[in-house]
Amino acid sequence: MILNKLKMRQIKINSTTGSEIVLTATAKDYMRVSTTADDNIIGRMITQARIWCENYISRDIVAKNRTYYIPETNGTFDLPFAPVASISSITSDGTAVDYTVLGLDNETIELDGGSADKVKVTYVTSGLDDSLLQQAIMQLVSTYYDNRADFSSDQKSNIETIPTDVRDILNSYKSMFL
């Protein structure tokens, strides 16, 4: 059991550096909400929907500073939640290592020294922003908003599953990394 834990890859968000791609006003227009009474709730739902979408596609929609840990590598590996804007550092067992960035989204790393242990990469993702992602987030926010009070103590969850059209929109962005 301990051996398996030592072999686990880990990813951590150090900070969120970007902004939401869907504004509260835009989501309210989409949902035809004219009052300001629910602005805070809708804002939180936008963040929740965006995070769900990011986890579904394994890509950052809003730019973030991340740290990725790999217990061992053959020298070539992919960074999760690309595209990558910049790499701050790569260390192996606490020592800086030289590397080459490969790929269209700067997500593939090749360590110049080959295989390495205890590799830690700190990097910044650039995020994604286009109308399809905005549409998926707005549809999901609308589902959350319309079902915000649909809870009952005798059922596990009354909220409808994620709308199929949201998944369909996101499938073209989906990375098979995680």
Residue ranges and their predicted role:
Residues 1-178:
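Divalent metal-cofactor coordination and adjacent catalytic microenvironments
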